[in-house]
Amino acid sequence: MKSSVAQVRGSNYDKVDTRSSSERSSSPEDSNEERSPSPRDRGYSNRSRDYSDRDRYEDRSRSGRYDRSDESRRRERERSTSPRDRGYTDRRRGYSDRDGYGNDRSRNGRYDRSEDNREREKRQNYQDRDYEKRSPPARRRSPPARRSEEQTEEQNQTEPPVKKKKEELDPILTRTGGAYIPPARLRMMQEQITDKSSMAYQRMSWEALKKSINGLVNKVNVSNIGNIIQELLQENIVRGRGLLARSVLQAQSASPIFTHVYAALVSIINSKFPHIGELILKRLILNFRKGYRRNDKQLCLTSSKFVAHLINQNVAHEVLALEMLTLLLERPNDDSVEVAIGFLKESGLKLTQVTPRGINAIFERLRNILHESEIDKRVQYMIEVMFAVRKDGFKDHPVIPEGLDLVEEEDQFTHMLPLEDDYNQEDVLNVFKMDPDFLENEEKYKAIKKEILDEGDSDSEGDANEGSEDESEEEEEDGQEAGTEGEKMTIHDKTEVNLVAFRRTIYLAIQSSLDFEECAHKLIKMDFPESQTKELCNMILDCCAQQRTYEKFFGLLAGRFCLLKKEYLEAFENIFKEQFETIHRLETNKLRNVAKMFAHLLYTDSLPWSVLECMNLSEETTTSSSRIFVKIFFQELCEYMGLPKLNARLKDVTLQPFFQGLLPMDNPKNTRFAINFFTSIGLGGLTDELREHLKNAPKMIMTQKQNVESSDSSSDSSSGSESSSDSDSSSSSSSESSSSSSDSDSSRRKKHSQKKKKSREAHKAASKKQAPDDRRKEAPKHKHQKEKYDDKQSRKSKRDSKN
């Protein structure tokens, strides 16, 4: 078996080896070649050779011999040189003793190695081959030039390692917050710069200005705002107006609770430098529009709150507020309504004072949103709270808080900036820019600063003097008052807190009662003062009016109180008169409930029928609401009592003086109106007497006219007799003086009296010939004609008596 395997391997070797047997020789050198081991046995691994079949190669090297020529042997020797001699360095292979590489070979060219070393190198070769298969094919490179170790060591010693140097940056030119410069070093740097118009000095002054403005704005509050303003004016805020605007807006957005303080600060600066106030307002408007477009509720809330306080300080015009509210409520959602309500709370009182029509339109829009729009419950409650705040007069949201009204009205400057205009927020003012006229501008601002601060000092001194004088005068007046008046001051509470609590207690007692007797018992047990009696009756009536339909519970409760005390009875009588006079203020449902309750009180005789004295049925004295009230009132009475009993009660002789306005008979026009009214509501049976009176009115007028004429004639005759007696007395006195003059006077008087009698008879005859139709037409005006006639007759009688 072994011999066959050896034969197979030998045949394969003959096929692989391209060199023929003719190339081999049997020279003495072949013996040396036989003794020389194969390259594999010498431990070389040349990558240029391909040892594809290592086992067969080993067998050939052991059994077979090479027969090569001189040229082939020379090539073999060149190939068999060490890797180090060929200039290759393989780091994965370890040559522990490179210098002794040549000593390992014996004189006959063989290595003296043990079997273990061969196995170790075999494993190393297999690992190298596997690694080369796994790694990607590398691009072939030419072998590097061979260098000696001495040359490489000398080169390493002559070339030291090169280190990269970091470029040192000027701390002044770094961005904000990038580098901290201690104050001492900053002063030293400023002292070193001699040219104050240079860019470095301007840069340092800009950084100092930025830090100063930012620090002062962050420190401002109600107590120190005056000092902060003076320190701010010490800085060049004209040059740093962009920094000031940015600091104010950032501080306000970070702490919105101090918005009123920042608004007062802006108001003071705006009075001295209006262009700075305009810049801040422009940026605020742009921030609001940006937040509205991005649906950023927080940005809209902060910016709108700042705008509201600037409107209160008269920095911005109220038209801007109306435009913002209109925009927010045009297409309402939860966030926009919330922003609008926050804006209204801050500026509602100012808008109410300045533009009441505009604020009414805004609240009407809010009412429509509350009833029609589908919004969240929380937002609905916010709208209701807003209406309550408006009803209280914005008492928790004053226009300008105490201590911040620091600008005189004549010094205020109001900016008219619409919401929809295009504005430039001038962001270039926020960054440093070299000023070629730096020194001139600094001198100009120093002059402005001196003027402003001098004015402020004079104003403060004047205010201090005036304040000291006022304080001295007040002290003197207080001393005089303390000496003259030793009485204690009484404080009157006009907030009606107790009244609200009392009404709440009554309402809860009414709502928690099962029947009217239990409710009356609870209310009587309450120890409330007598001054609250009318308020109790009003509360019962209000609770009745608030119901959807009339409940008999309230009529029985009111009747029980009317029967208990006379004070309650008088209170309900006064309430009936007040309600009838102001009935036009009630809605139809409330009006119906009130009318039915008072009808119940009259039907049960809890109230006297004398309360109907306030009703006066005529076209001039009634309104649509009062006519509806009377209609429901009498229909309810007719339903309770029936028409016969009601008619009998209205015809009661003892009550007729109280029904003269309800059933008028003084004027046919009013009588006809009352008849038509009761007939239209289905109670025509109550107007029988009125109809008879209207039919008999002409006859009564005729008789009254005749009686008046007879009384006039009797009065004329009595006046004539008086005049004759006067003439007789005068004639008797004149007869004593001269008899001739008395005769002439008596004859004249006789002729005059005869003419007067004839004229009276003719007047009576003419009056009897007048047609009855004319008398009927003149019947309504008879009273006025009678008065005119009496006046004429009295004047004639006086003239006759004089004659």
From Swiss-Prot:
Q: What is this protein called?
A: Pre-mRNA-splicing factor CWC22 homolog
Q: Does the keyword Transferase apply?
A: no
**What keywords does the record list, in alphabetical order?**
mRNA processing, mRNA splicing, Nucleus, Spliceosome
**How is the subunit organization of this protein annotated in UniProt?**
Component of the pre-catalytic spliceosome B and the catalytic spliceosome C complexes.
In what residue span(s) does the MIF4G domain sit?
Answer: 210-393
Task: Indicate, by first and last residue, each region the UniProt record lists as having compositional bias (Acidic residues).
Answer: 454-480
Q: Name one GO biological process term.
A: mRNA splicing, via spliceosome
Q: Which gene encodes it?
A: cwc22
Question: What is known about what this protein does?
Answer: Required for pre-mRNA splicing as component of the spliceosome. Promotes exon-junction complex (EJC) assembly.
Q: Where is the composition biased (Polar residues)?
A: 1-10
Keyword Nucleus attributed? yes
Q: Where is the composition biased (Basic and acidic residues)?
A: 12-22, 33-135, 787-803
Q: Where is the composition biased (Low complexity)?
A: 709-744
Record's superkingdom? Eukaryota
> What does the similarity note say?
Belongs to the CWC22 family.
Localization (cell) = Nucleus; Nucleus speckle
Gene Ontology MF terms in the entry: RNA binding
Quick one: where's region Disordered? 1-178, 451-490, 703-803
Q: Which residue ranges does the record assign to the MI domain? A: 501-617
Q: Could you tell me which InterPro entries the record lists for this protein?
A: ARM-type_fold, CWC22_splicing_factor, Initiation_fac_eIF4g_MI, MIF4G-like_typ-3
**Taxonomy of the source species:** Eukaryota, Metazoa, Chordata, Craniata, Vertebrata
Where do Basic residues bias regions lie?
A: 748-767
> One GO CC annotation, please?
catalytic step 2 spliceosome
